[in-house]
């Protein structure tokens, strides 16, 4: 890759200091003063870069690696050439995340779209809105009547903050996002194009065969340290609240229906759909393209495999997969049995396809 001007190199941190900051042990103390300026993948890392390895699959890439250090565990350290210093840790993935945050802190939240700071010309701030000192609003953003925004928060170009919305401190509302009927905590990141607080999908049968819209008069509550991906949609509650718990991370293109309650520190991957009034416990992980039926409960610490369909409650701590989702051991056993029967049937037909 040519020089990446989107994320310029760090001015430099001592390798020894980096090791201390990420909780790793440096294999060669003689290089502790070497400066580290950035992160890079193994195959193109150069002097001044730090990279990481989680498996032996990258072994061949070590031949071209010129990194100043590799973050890895003991099992991987045994295959790293002696010319490359090792930052030894039991949790290399976590250590690399910490290193990246130190070296490229500006990449932890969406970047500024203009060089302007403060309230930019072209932004519309309703006279009744209240903004603490240090709020930044980019051109073409709209802040509605009675909205309140905490210090250190950035409202990017084209974002819309609806009337009476509350946004805490040190948040980022990215370009083109819209926030309506919502209370948002501190250190929340909303990525471009996300839609928060629009009305949920609720209709009743009409007297003449049509559909009558059910009013949605609830709110969305997003707690501290939540991150919501681009083009994700979170509907407000019908009469209650839709809640996203503290520290939860939601990928791009996720749909969260009205009255859903998601616990703390969950991870929800792209294209997941969660229907209205579902309950998601703390620490739940949901793989990409999974669907969660309305009014179901997923217990604390449960894991849902990608492309699964959750039609009924999932107990705490369980791993479920398949359609309909069931205990992973049962699902995998069924898949293996179907594959075996298919193979036997194919052999009986002399290897000929139907």
Curated annotation (Swiss-Prot):
Pathway, per record: Bacterial outer membrane biogenesis; LPS lipid A biosynthesis
Active site positions: 258
InterPro entries, A to Z: Hexapep, Hexapep_transf_CS, LpxD, Trimer_LpxA-like_sf, UDP_GlcNAc_AcTrfase_non-rep
Gene Ontology CC entries for this record: membrane
GO biological process, one term: lipid A biosynthetic process
Keywords attached to this entry: Acyltransferase, Lipid A biosynthesis, Lipid biosynthesis, Lipid metabolism, Repeat, Transferase
Cited PROSITE patterns: HEXAPEP_TRANSFERASES (PS00101)
A Pfam family it matches: Hexapep
Gene Ontology MF term list: N-acyltransferase activity
Catalytic activity of the protein: a UDP-3-O-[(3R)-3-hydroxyacyl]-alpha-D-glucosamine + a (3R)-hydroxyacyl-[ACP] = a UDP-2-N,3-O-bis[(3R)-3-hydroxyacyl]-alpha-D-glucosamine + holo-[ACP] + H(+)
SUPFAM superfamilies: Trimeric LpxA-like enzymes (SSF51161)
EC numbers on record: 2.3.1.191
Family: Belongs to the transferase hexapeptide repeat family. LpxD subfamily.
Role this protein plays: Catalyzes the N-acylation of UDP-3-O-acylglucosamine using 3-hydroxyacyl-ACP as the acyl donor. Is involved in the biosynthesis of lipid A, a phosphorylated glycolipid that anchors the lipopolysaccharide to the outer membrane of the cell.
Protein name per UniProt: UDP-3-O-acylglucosamine N-acyltransferase
Species the sequence originates in: Sinorhizobium fredii (strain NBRC 101917 / NGR234)
């Amino acid at each position: 890759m040519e020089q990446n001007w989107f994320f310029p190199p760090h001015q430099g941190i001592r390798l020894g200091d980096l090791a201390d900051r990420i909780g790793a042990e440096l294999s060669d103390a003689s290089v502790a003063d070497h400066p580290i300026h950035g992160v890079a993948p193994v195959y193109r890392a150069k002097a001044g870069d730090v990279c990481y390895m989680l498996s032996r699959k990258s072994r061949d890439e070590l031949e071209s690696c010129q990194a100043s250090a590799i973050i890895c565990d003991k099992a991987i350290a045994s295959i790293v050439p002696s010319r490359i210093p090792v930052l030894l840790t039991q949790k290399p993935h976590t250590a690399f995340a910490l290193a990246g945050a130190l070296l490229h802190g500006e990449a932890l939240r969406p970047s500024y779209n203009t060089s302007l700071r403060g309230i930019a010309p072209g932004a519309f701030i309703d006279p009744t809105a209240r903004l603490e000192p240090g709020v930044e609003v980019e051109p073409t953003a709209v802040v509605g009547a009675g909205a309140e925004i905490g210090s250190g928060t950035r409202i990017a170009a084209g974002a819309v903050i609806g009337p009476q919305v509350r946004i805490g401190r040190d948040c980022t509302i990215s370009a083109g996002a819209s926030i309506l009927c919502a209370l948002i905590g501190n250190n929340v990141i909303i990525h471009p194009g996300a839609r928060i607080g629009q009305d949920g999908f609720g209709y009743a049968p009409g007297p003449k065969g049509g559909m009558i819209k059910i009013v949605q008069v609830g709110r969305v509550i997003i707690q501290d340290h939540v991150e919501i991906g681009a083009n994700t949609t979170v509907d407000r509650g019908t009469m209650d609240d839709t809640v996203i718990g503290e520290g939860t991370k939601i990928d791009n293109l996720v749909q969260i229906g009205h009255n859903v309650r998601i616990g703390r520190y969950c991870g929800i991957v792209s294209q997941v759909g969660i229907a209205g009034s579902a309950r998601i416990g703390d620490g739940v992980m949901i793989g990409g393209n999974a669907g969660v039926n309305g009014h179901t409960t997923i217990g604390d610490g449960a894991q849902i495999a990608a492309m699964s369909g959750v039609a009924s409650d999932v107990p705490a701590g369980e791993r479920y997969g398949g359609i309909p989702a069931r205990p992973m051991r049962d699902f995998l056993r069924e898949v293996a049995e179907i594959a075996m029967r298919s193979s036997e049937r194919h052999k009986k037909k002399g290897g000929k396809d139907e």
